[in-house]
Swiss-Prot record:
Cofactor: Mg(2+)
Manner of cofactor binding, per the entry note: Binds 2 magnesium ions per subunit.
Lineage of the organism: Bacteria, Pseudomonadati, Pseudomonadota, Gammaproteobacteria, Enterobacterales
Protein name: Xylose isomerase
Broad enzyme group: isomerase
Record text on subunit structure and interactions: Homotetramer.
Length: 440
């Protein structure tokens, strides 16, 4: 079959001095960083939906891209053509993983029977493509938010029949992910929220989605899936308020339904922005709570209040993110999926490569800077010094529950405690980070 990206053989590493826009300047898959291959640290994935499904339409304009597989025709044949181009792209970009929603790769059809039959055929196609290319599935998921039936949510829908349809999609997508060797399964609550409290029963909807997630966990164990289940937090859009608002909110939900040992989080940078947090904050919070799983690497626009899904280009932001991930031991089943899309005006098909190449170089350079921060250890030393008092006898007695509140008050009075504030040295630490970022 004629190659779609026929002017490119493969994107290769050419080094920082290269001016070739179709080459990596910082991402060298085999380069060792802290004794581990860069490819194994970063575990890059390209997403199916923004890259091959979005046609360039927005709220104010029709599709602008005119991709061959987005033209009128027989749905399954177009899906197979899309798979041909997708795996050509994955191979030429040199990414080890990809991610998909069920209806990204397969026509939804007019009934559950058609949906399942179409998906089964496309899973066989994807399995063959994976075998031929060596590209693996980082995670799969089900799109339970686009179809009008999900206008009021899927698991939180007031109609149990919609809940049941969503369950069918999730079971089918989980089975497909398992068959394709996927390392994770993601649950994003696209419309699991509300537009107005005037017609919403919060307790009822919370019970529904809690039971849905328990059923997902039960099915995971029943089918023998060894991968990780991931919830992707997002505060709003498309609904006014979503129940998986941010990492801390998701953790509270998991604790309520006894799922904190079963489900982790897939953190998207742009969703952190929408929640009023930094990407760094959400990563660090997930690690502190023991639920860090995977990352959707992108960026938002601080001037815009919606999910712009741009490619990550800030080394300053992502070096701190990679620093937290390295300190936590790195990814296990997760990775860096580029949940990002070219701009509507970027109509050249090679713009898809430019966006991903820049993002991969950004994350590779961020990794190398983060590794220097880890090796130097200065930030860790200063944090340890700041909290050193908690290693004292008093600090340990407090943490181990050996002193009551009253006993602690008595201790303070008996020892005439008069603590003096110690500087947090924020400016010094910010300057230190700049040295890692900008000094050769």
């Amino acid at each position: 079959m004629q190659a779609y990206f026929d002017q490119l053989d493969r994107v290769r590493y050419e080094g920082p001095q290269s001016t070739n826009p179709l080459a990596f300047r910082h991402y060298n898959p085999d380069e060792l960083v802290l004794g581990k291959r860069m490819e194994d640290h970063l575990r890059f994935a390209a997403c199916y939906w923004h890259t091959f499904c979005w046609n360039g339409a927005d709220m104010f304009g029709v599709g602008a891209f005119n991709r061959p597989w987005q033209q009128p025709g027989e749905a399954l044949e177009l899906a197979k053509r899309k798979a041909d181009v997708a795996f050509e792209f994955f191979h030429k970009l040199n990414v080890p993983f990809y991610c998909f929603h069920d209806v990204d790769v397969s026509p939804e059809g007019a009934s559950l029977k058609e949906y399942k039959n179409n998906f089964a055929q496309m899973v066989d196609v994807l399995a063959a493509k994976q075998e031929q290319s060596g590209v693996k599935l980082l995670w799969g998921t089900a799109n339970c938010f686009t179809n009008p039936r999900y206008g009021a949510g899927a698991a939180t829908n007031p109609d149990p029949e919609v809940f049941s349809w969503a369950a069918t999609q999730v079971v089918t997508a989980m089975n497909a992910t398992h068959k394709l060797g996927g390392e994770n399964y993601v649950l994003w609550g696209g419309r699991e929220g509300y537009e107005t409290l005037l017609n919403t029963d919060l307790r009822q909807e919370r019970e529904q989605i809690g039971r849905f997630m328990q059923m997902v966990v039960e099915h995971k164990h029943k089918m023998g899936f060894q991968g990780t289940l991931l919830i992707e937090p997002k505060p709003q859009e498309p609904t006014k308020h979503q129940y998986d608002y941010d990492v801390a909110t998701v953790y509270g939900f998991l604790k309520q339904f006894g799922l904190e040992k079963e489900i982790k989080v897939n953190i998207e940078a742009n969703h952190a922005t929408l929640a009023g947090h930094s990407f760094h904050h959400e990563i660090a919070t997930a690690i502190a709570l023991g639920i860090f799983g995977s990352v959707d690497a992108n960026r938002g626009d601080a001037q815009l209040g919606w999910d712009t899904d741009q490619f990550p280009i800030s080394v300053e932001e992502n070096a701190l993110v990679m620093y937290e991930i390295l300190k936590a031991g790195g990814f296990t089943t997760g990775g860096l999926n580029f949940d990002a899309k070219v701009r509507r005006q970027s109509t050249d098909k090679y713009d898809l490569f430019y966006g991903h190449i820049g993002a991969m170089d950004t994350m590779a350079l961020s990794l190398k800077i983060a590794a220097r921060m880890v090796e130097d250890g200065e930030l860790d030393k200063r944090v340890a010094k700041r909290y050193a008092g908690w290693n004292s006898e008093l600090g340990q007695q407090i943490l181990k529950g050996q002193l009551s509140l009253g006993e602690l008050a008595q201790y303070a009075e008996q020892h005439n405690l008069a603590p003096v504030h110690q500087s947090g040295h924020q400016e010094l630490l910010e300057n230190l980070v700049n040295r890692y970022l900008f000094d050769k």
